[in-house]
A protein has these predicted regions:
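Contiguous beta-strand/loop segments that form the cofactor/metal-binding neighborhood of enzyme cores
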Residues: 198-284, 316-337, 354-357
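C-terminal helix-rich "cap/oligomerization" subdomain common to oxidoreductases
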Residues: 61, 71, 118, 327-362
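A contiguous active-site-proximal alpha/beta segment in oxidoreductase catalytic domains
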Residues: 101-179
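Mid-domain beta-loop-alpha active-site segment that forms a flexible
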Residues: 123-130, 160-224
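N-terminal Rossmann-like dinucleotide-binding module
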Residues: 1-50
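Hydrophobic residues in well-ordered beta-strands that form the structural core
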Residues: 95-96, 120-122, 278
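C-terminal glycine/acidic-rich active-site capping loop/insertion
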Residues: 168-197, 268-341
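Beta-loop-alpha module in the N-terminal Rossmann-like domain of NAD(P)-dependent dehydrogenases
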Residues: 50-112
Length: 362
C-alpha cells in the first residue's frame, strides 16, 4: 500500500486525541513528516510522543522547508491561509471543520483545488460513521419525506467532559487565542454586517459543532431550501431555524447548549411510508455506534383489521469514524479518480446554508 507523506498543522486537542493516534496506527498508509504549532514547545512534546522527526512553529515554515509532502492535515482554528498555500502548491489538503469562516474564502479554496488538481477534504467525521451512513441510506428510501428535525444539544465543553483523556491533553503555555483575538469574529462580523453579540456567538457555534448537523442534514436533503427563517436566543447559545423546500418538505434545525451533562444529536425524518430516526453517538466515545430506528406499517393482510407497525433498530459498526475518515483521505490521495465524500464543494454548500440561516435570524 502506498504511504502518504503528511505534515500536521496544529497540535491542539483534536490532533492529540484523534488524528495523531490514528495516523500512527495507520502507519502502513501514512508517514508523519513534520508537525507545527505556534507553541513550538508544545509541538516538540507532541512530536516526541509520536516519533515525528521535524517540528516547526509556523505553517509557512513547514510548507516551505519539508520536502516531498503529499498532503497536509490542517487542525488549527482558522484553516483558510494554510489551506490556500498548500492547495496553490498542489498539496492534497484535509482541514478540520469548518473549512473556513466566510463564503468568499470557501469559494477561493474550492476554485484553487479545482485549478491545481489537489484534493480538498473537510473533516466531517460523522459522515464516516457507519451508523450515520446507514441512517442516510434509510432516509433515501422514504418515498415522500414530509418533515425533518435535526438537533444538537450539548452539555459543558460541547460534551468533551465525557472522556478522561481530555484532562491529559497537553496545553500550550499562556492564554490561547480566542475567536475575538485571532480574526474569526471579525470575519463573522463582515459576513453578517452586524456586531450583535448574540448573532456572533451563534455564528461561532454554527461554524463549530453545529456545522456537523448542517452537513448531515444536507446529505439527506441536498437541495437548497426555498425559504429560511431563524430565531436566536439573547445569549446566542440557542438557535432554531425553519427551512422550507420546493417539494413541500419542512425541516427544523435546533442547536443549543445546556449546563446538564448530556449529548443529544439526532436527525429524524417523517415520510409518507416510514419514519427514520438517526441517533448520533458522542464522537469522543471511541467505537460507540450510532443507532438508526425505522418505523413503518406492514403491508395489509386478510383477516387483519389494520396493518401492524414494525420498528427496526440498526446499530452501526464499532469501527471508529475518525479512523475511517483518515482511511478515506488516504484513498482519495492515492486514487486519482476518487473524490472526497466530504469535499470542499460540499462544505461550500454547507456554508451557504449556514449563512442563510444566520442572516435570517432575529
Amino acid at each position: 500500500m502506498s504511504r502518504v507523506r503528511v505534515g500536521i498543522l496544529g497540535c491542539g486537542m483534536i490532533a492529540q486525541l484523534m488524528h495523531l493516534p490514528y495516523l500512527t496506527e495507520l502507519e502502513d498508509r501514512f508517514e508523519i513528516a513534520a508537525l507545527c504549532d505556534q507553541d513550538k514547545a508544545l509541538a516538540q512534546r507532541v512530536a516526541a510522543r509520536h516519533r515525528v522527526p521535524r517540528v516547526h512553529d509556523s505553517w509557512e515554515n513547514l510548507l516551505d522547508t519539508v520536502p516531498s509532502l503529499d498532503a497536509v492535515l490542517i487542525l488549527n482554528k482558522d484553516h483558510f491561509a494554510p489551506a490556500l498555500m498548500a492547495l496553490e502548491r498542489g498539496i492534497h489538503t484535509f482541514t478540520e471543520k469548518p473549512l473556513c469562516y466566510t463564503q468568499g474564502e470557501a469559494e477561493q479554496l474550492v476554485g484553487t483545488a479545482e485549478r491545481t488538481g489537489a484534493k480538498l477534504m473537510v473533516g466531517y467525521m460523522k459522515r464516516y460513521d457507519s451508523g450515520v451512513r446507514r441512517g442516510l441510506e434509510e432516509m433515501r428510501r422514504i418515498s415522500a419525506p414530509r418533515m425533518a428535525r435535526a438537533h444538537i444539544v450539548v452539555g459543558p465543553d460541547y460534551g468533551n467532559w465525557i472522556i478522561p483523556e481530555i484532562q491529559r491533553i497537553d496545553r500550550p503555555a499562556g492564554a490561547e487565542a480566542d475567536s475575538g483575538t485571532d480574526g474569526r469574529t471579525a470575519k463573522a462580523r463582515g459576513e453578517l454586517g452586524t456586531g450583535s453579540p448574540a448573532l456572533l456567538a451563534a455564528y461561532m457555534d454554527m461554524f463549530g459543532v453545529w456545522s456537523h448537523d448542517i452537513n448531515v442534514l444536507r446529505a439527506a436533503f441536498p437541495a437548497a431550501p426555498t425559504s429560511v427563517t431563524a430565531r436566536v436566543s439573547p445569549d446566542g447559545g440557542t438557535l432554531t431555524a425553519l427551512l422550507g423546500h420546493a417539494d413541500g418538505l419542512q425541516c427544523v434545525f435546533l442547536g443549543g447548549k445546556t449546563s446538564v451533562r448530556l449529548f443529544e444529536e439526532n436527525l429524524t425524518v417523517w415520510g409518507s411510508d416510514r419514519v427514520v430516526e438517526l441517533h448520533i453517538s458522542n464522537p469522543f466515545l471511541r467505537h460507540v455506534p450510532s443507532t438508526v430506528r425505522v418505523r413503518q406499517d406492514e403491508a395489509p393482510s386478510s383477516g387483519r383489521p389494520r396493518p401492524l407497525t414494525v420498528e427496526r433498530t440498526v446499530d452501526g459498526s464499532h469501527h471508529e469514524a475518525f479512523k475511517a475518515q483518515l482511511c478515506h483521505f488516504h484513498a482519495c490521495v492515492t486514487t486519482p479518480e476518487l473524490q472526497p465524500l466530504t469535499s470542499g464543494q460540499e462544505s461550500l454548500e454547507d456554508i451557504r446554508l449556514m449563512l442563510a440561516i444566520l442572516r435570517s435570524a432575529r
